[in-house]
């Protein structure tokens, strides 16, 4: 359970970083 939560959290953070990167490219 804990391992899964860490993986999900890591994936969400990676997604947010990717979105921020894409937004910077567009601006």
Swiss-Prot record:
Highest taxon listed in the record's lineage: Bacteria
Membrane topology: Single-pass membrane protein
InterPro entries, per the entry: DinQ-like
Transmembrane segments: 6-26
Keyword field contains Cell inner membrane: yes
Alphabetic keyword roster: Cell inner membrane, Cell membrane, Membrane, Transmembrane, Transmembrane helix
GO biological process: DNA damage response
One GO CC term, this protein: membrane
Subcellular location: Cell inner membrane
Upregulating conditions: Repressed by LexA, induced by DNA damage.
UniProt KW Membrane keyword: yes
Family: Belongs to the DinQ family.
Protein's UniProt name: Uncharacterized protein DinQ
């Amino acid at each position: 359970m804990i391992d899964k939560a860490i993986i999900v959290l890591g994936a969400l953070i990676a997604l947010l970083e990717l979105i921020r990167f894409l937004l910077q490219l567009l601006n």
